């Protein structure tokens, strides 16, 4: 004979009904519940994907956006390294953008999206700005019109990064004497690999 507790559990399970999708290929969604999956054929797959399960968590979110909010000319540090520094971080989800060095450090292997917009102000020189990955240029952008007071070098790219890889902007040609207010540098993890 079934005990009272067992009857209550059976009744609750019957009322809740089965967790199901519309068809066999649709995932089962159990909102607010923990689902434990056991593999009857375990392997030594270190990635944990032997079952074909992809797990996303809040810690997988990675994004940053930094701007230049003042029109100060480059500092001694900028003149020496030619790295383009940003003085205000608007978004830094995951804390992977080092604001002191204006460098993004990849927290995991994945595909990342970057874009930049570097404004030159009252400067008749052509500038070349490059997105650097571990010290090597990936993409560049140019601004060289001598008849305008403000012009921007802009570009964007998707790149594969390994954990610990560093991305930053470098002034490869010209100077930013006059400042670079309104310049931006942003990036985010598109998906992990």
UniProtKB/Swiss-Prot annotation:
The keyword Acetylation does not apply. Changing residue 147 to A: Abolishes GRID2 interaction. The keyword Transferase does not apply. In the Purkinje cells postsynaptic structures. In the cerebellum, cerebellin is much less abundant than [des-Ser1]-cerebellin. Glycans are attached at residues 23, 79. One of its GO terms (molecular function) is identical protein binding. Residues 57-193 form the C1q domain. It is found in: Secreted; Postsynaptic cell membrane. Residues 122-147 are annotated as: Essential for interaction with GRID2. The proteolytic processing to yield cerebellin seems to occur either prior to the secretion by presynaptic neurons and subsequent oligomerization or in some other location after release of the mature protein. Sialoglycoprotein. Homohexamer; disulfide-linked homotrimers. The trimers associate via N-terminal cysteine residues to form disulfide-linked hexamers. May form oligomers with CBLN2, CBLN3 AND CBLN4 prior to secretion. Once secreted, does not interact with other CBLN family members. Interacts with GRID1. Interacts with NRXN1 and NRXN2 long (alpha) and short (beta) isoforms produced by alternative promoter usage. Competes with NLGN1 for NRXN1-binding. Weakly interacts with NRXN3 short isoform and not at all with NRXN3 long isoform. This is Cerebellin-1. The lineage of its organism: Eukaryota, Metazoa, Chordata, Craniata, Vertebrata.
């Amino acid at each position: 004979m079934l005990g009272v507790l067992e009857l209550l559990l059976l009744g609750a399970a019957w009322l809740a009904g089965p967790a199901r999708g519309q068809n066999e290929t649709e995932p089962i969604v159990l909102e607010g519940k923990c689902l434990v999956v056991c593999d009857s054929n375990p392997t030594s797959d270190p990635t944990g994907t032997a079952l074909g399960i992809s797990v996303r968590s809040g810690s997988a979110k990675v994004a940053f956006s930094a701007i230049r909010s003042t029109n100060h000319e480059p500092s001694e540090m900028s003149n020496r390294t030619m790295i383009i520094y940003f003085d205000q971080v608007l978004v830094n989800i995951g804390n992977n953008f080092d604001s002191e060095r204006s460098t993004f450090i990849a927290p995991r292997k994945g595909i990342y999206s970057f874009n930049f917009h570097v404004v030159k102000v009252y400067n008749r020189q052509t500038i070349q700005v490059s997105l650097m990955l571990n010290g090597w240029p990936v993409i560049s952008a140019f601004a060289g019109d001598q008849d305008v007071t403000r012009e921007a070098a802009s570009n964007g790219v998707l790149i594969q990064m390994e954990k610990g890889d560093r991305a930053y902007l470098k002034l490869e040609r010209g100077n930013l004497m006059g400042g670079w207010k309104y310049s931006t540098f942003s990036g985010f993890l598109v998906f992990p690999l």
